[in-house]
């Protein structure tokens, strides 16, 4: 199966079922006679723009552009390696390759307090409206990250 067709199949599966692990996705692909390695599947998920959300004590994959409105700070806290602040800008450190996916989620779910994002490979800049908002977000992120 071609990559484009495989991506379409994965998107279809994600919209029809709440799949929590790459293994579940891989098993569903195999049921459609599509065999992929874990490495290929990871790359596919990143290219498609899938991320995990936690809702009602369930964790499952969703397409980034189809995420429901979420508690952005709580969501980010589950995906960050570190947080720093420079005046009105938050510097969020992620695992390699996750910053751009998280930037898309922030952009889809942002409110009037967030102006925009800039993403690198493992660093996400969140530009807040002012220093006060950045400080509030930083404090809440650090609090939530302590509990992980």
From Swiss-Prot:
This is Arginine repressor. GO terms for molecular function: arginine binding; cis-regulatory region sequence-specific DNA binding; DNA-binding transcription factor activity. Pfam families: Arg_repressor (PF01316), Arg_repressor_C (PF02863). InterPro entries: Arg_repress (IPR001669), Arg_repress_C (IPR020899), Arg_repress_C_sf (IPR036251), Arg_repress_DNA-bd (IPR020900), WH-like_DNA-bd_sf (IPR036388), WH_DNA-bd_sf (IPR036390). GO terms for cellular component: cytoplasm; transcription regulator complex. The keyword Amino-acid biosynthesis applies. SUPFAM superfamilies: C-terminal domain of arginine repressor, Winged helix' DNA-binding domain. It is found in: Cytoplasm. Regulates arginine biosynthesis genes. Gene3D superfamilies: 3.30.1360.40, Winged helix-like DNA-binding domain superfamily/Winged helix DNA-binding domain (1.10.10.10). GO terms for biological process: L-arginine biosynthetic process; protein complex oligomerization; regulation of arginine biosynthetic process; regulation of arginine metabolic process. Pathway: Amino-acid biosynthesis; L-arginine biosynthesis [regulation]. HAMAP family: Arg_repressor. Keywords: Amino-acid biosynthesis, Arginine biosynthesis, Cytoplasm, DNA-binding, Repressor, Transcription, Transcription regulation. It comes from Streptococcus pneumoniae (strain ATCC BAA-255 / R6). The lineage of its organism: Bacteria, Bacillati, Bacillota, Bacilli, Lactobacillales. Belongs to the ArgR family.
């Amino acid at each position: 199966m071609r990559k484009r067709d495989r991506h379409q199949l994965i998107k279809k599966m994600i919209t029809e079922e709440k799949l929590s692990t790459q293994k579940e996705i891989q098993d569903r692909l195999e049921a459609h006679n599509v065999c992929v390695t874990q490495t290929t599947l990871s790359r596919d998920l990143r290219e498609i723009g899938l991320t995990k959300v936690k809702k009602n004590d369930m964790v499952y994959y969703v397409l980034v552009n189809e995420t429901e409105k979420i508690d952005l700070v709580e969501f980010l806290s589950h995906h960050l390696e570190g947080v720093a602040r420079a005046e009105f800008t938050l510097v969020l450190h992620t695992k390699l390759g996750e910053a751009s996916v998280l930037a898309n989620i922030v952009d889809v779910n942002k409110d009037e307090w967030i102006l925009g994002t800039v993403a690198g490979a493992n660093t996400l800049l969140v530009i807040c409206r002012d220093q006060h908002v950045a400080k509030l977000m930083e404090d809440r992120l650090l609090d939530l990250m302590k509990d992980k």
